[in-house]
Each structure stands twice: as structure tokens, then as C-alpha cells.
Amino acid sequence: MKKHLRWIIAIIVLAVMGVAYYYYLANKPADKDATESVADSNSELSYLVSRNIEDNYPESVRDVVKLYARITKAYYESDVSEENIEKLGRQARILFDDELKNTQTEDEFLSALKEDISIYRNNNAKISSFNIQTANNTRYTKFNNREYASIELVYYIREGTQLRTSGTKFTLRRDNSGTVSYTHLRAH
């Protein structure tokens, strides 16, 4: 009986700690993110802007989506210049398949991106973190002799003192060369 009581108390304590941590994250000031310093943010931006994606393409479905999420998170930082937003946008487009790229020109994409970033900044919003589903939950399918993989990502977005989530499902398509890595990205 005492053993069961200890387990129940331990579970209750862990649940209270989880709720308290969520409350802490949801109510801390937006300009002080405990998970990231300004130096880390600047080095991340430098890395993302200068990375040679074409020669060093991510090897797995999860890595492609993770790189795209890191680029997206960097867009919405308040101190990112318009020049760096354009560089990040070009980096993100490298991850898009040709079909997705052809839906809008690079200039149209960058214009829409800047408009979206402006809305986020006006709402005092930024992506504080993201979470990609595990590789075990990635769904692989074949359609018209092409291989596809679907994976989900959740962005945690801070607007002022509020924390909300935004889910995105990505479908990646294996390229025609038949290489092991997936080289195309399409967001739903």
C-alpha cells in the first residue's frame, strides 16, 4: 500500500512541476527567453545565412525539416535585418521542390515573407522554439512511382506574454536521382 502511495505522490508532484513550468514559460517576459542568448541567436543567424545547403544537404527527412524550422525561427527574431531576411529566404527556397518554387517567383516569396514578418513583429510575436515528431512517426508512401515522406512540426509562438502552438505537416519527395536523402520540401 505504501509503495502505491509513493507512486501516486510522485506522479502528482511531476504533474504539478509540468504545469508550473508551462505557466512559467507562458508568463515570462517576451524579451527574456531563458533558452537563448543574443550571442547564440547571432551565431545561429550567421550559420544559417552562410551554410552551403546545396553542397551539404541534410541527410534525413527530419534533418531537412529541422533546418527549415531553424531558418523559419530565425526570420522572426526582432533584430534580423531585411538583408538577412532575404538571405534566409533564399536558403529556405533551396529546400523547396521545383513544383513548390514555381508557385511564386523569388521576389513574390520574399515580399510575402517580409509582410508576414511585419505582422508578427507588430503583434510582438516570435517563434520561441519548435518540436519535430520522432523519426519513428514519419510516414512513408509511394504515389505515381515517387517516394514521399510526411512529418509534423509544432512551432511554439510567443505573442507578448502568451504562448501558443502552430502545427505544420510537411511532405517531402525523394529526388529523381534516387539518392537516399530527401531533397524536397512542401508545407501544408
Q: Where are the language model's segments positioned?
A:
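Surface-exposed, charged secondary-structure patches
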Residues: A112-G160
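Short glycine/proline-enriched turns and hinge-like loops at secondary-structure junctions
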Residues: Q162-T165
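Hydrophobic/aromatic beta-strand elements that line small-molecule binding cavities or substrate pockets
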Residues: T138, G167-R174
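Amphipathic, hydrophobic N-terminal targeting peptides for secretion and organelle import
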Residues: M1-S46
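Core segments of small alpha/beta cavity-forming domains
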Residues: S43-N122
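A generic beta-sheet turn/junction motif
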Residues: N144, R174-N176
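Conserved small/polar residues in nucleotide/adenosyl-binding loops
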Residues: T183-H188
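Tryptophan-centered short beta-strand motifs
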Residues: S177-Y182
